[in-house]
C-alpha cells in the first residue's frame, strides 16, 4: 500500500474541478478524451451534456461513457426508475428525484444522440463473470424486470 505522501503526490497530478456537466470551464479542443465514469446518467439533458464534452475535445477525440445502466427496452429502464424511487422514499421518507435526469441508456437514445451530434459510437461489452451473467435468468425466474447491463460507449468526434 502506498504511503500517504505517495497518494498526495499522485493526486496532485490531476485537477480537481467541480462544474456543471453542461457548462464545463475548459477551452474548445482542450482534451483528447472526456470520461463519464458513473456520471452520464445523472445528466439532465444527455444531448446538451455530450455536446459540451465534444466541444472540449480536439478533432478526432473521444467521449467515453462508462458505468451507466443500459436497457434493451425503455420499459425496463422506466421500471428500474420507479423501483429505485420507491426504495428511496421508503428509506428516507422523501423523493429522490428533485432534478430529473437521464437515469439510463437505450439503443434508441444512443442512436438519437449520434444523429443529433454527428458522432459514431463504439460499444464494448465487458464480462463480469458467471454470477453477473446469470442475473437475467434469475430475474426471469423470479418474474422481475430484466436487469441493466453496463456497457462502455465511445463517441468519436469527427476529424
Question: What would you call each of these model-derived segments?
Answer:
Residues 47-64:
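A short glycine-rich, Lys/Arg-flanked "PGG" loop and its adjoining helix->strand segment in the class I
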Residues 72, 86-108:
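Acceptor-substrate binding/catalytic loop of class I
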Residues 1-23:
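Class I SAM-dependent methyltransferase SAM/SAH-binding core
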Residues 99-125:
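Short alpha-helix
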Residues 21-34:
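A short acidic, Gly/Pro-enriched loop at the edge of an enzyme's catalytic core
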Residues 62-88:
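Conserved class I S-adenosyl-L-methionine
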Residues 33-46:
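A short SAM/SAH-binding and catalytic strip from SAM-dependent methyltransferases
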Residues 120-159:
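A C-terminal cap/extension of S-adenosyl-L-methionine-dependent methyltransferases
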Amino acid at each position: 500500500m502506498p504511503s500517504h505522501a505517495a497518494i498526495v503526490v499522485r493526486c496532485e497530478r490531476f485537477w480537481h474541478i467541480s462544474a456543471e456537466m453542461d457548462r464545463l470551464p475548459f477551452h474548445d479542443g482542450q482534451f483528447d478524451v472526456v470520461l463519464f465514469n458513473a456520471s452520464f446518467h445523472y445528466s439532465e439533458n444527455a444531448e446538451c451534456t455530450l455536446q459540451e464534452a465534444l466541444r472540449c475535445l480536439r478533432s478526432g477525440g473521444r467521449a467515453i461513457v462508462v458505468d451507466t445502466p443500459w436497457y434493451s427496452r425503455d420499459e425496463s429502464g422506466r421500471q428500474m426508475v420507479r423501483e429505485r424511487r420507491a426504495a428511496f422514499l421508503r428509506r428516507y421518507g422523501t423523493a429522490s428525484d428533485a432534478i430529473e435526469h437521464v437515469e439510463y441508456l437505450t439503443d434508441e437514445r444512443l442512436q438519437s444522440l449520434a444523429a443529433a451530434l454527428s458522432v459514431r459510437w463504439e460499444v464494448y461489452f465487458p464480462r463480469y463473470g458467471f454470477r453477473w451473467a446469470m442475473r437475467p435468468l434469475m430475474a426471469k425466474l423470479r418474474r422481475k424486470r430484466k436487469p441493466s447491463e453496463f456497457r462502455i460507449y465511445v463517441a468519436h468526434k469527427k476529424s
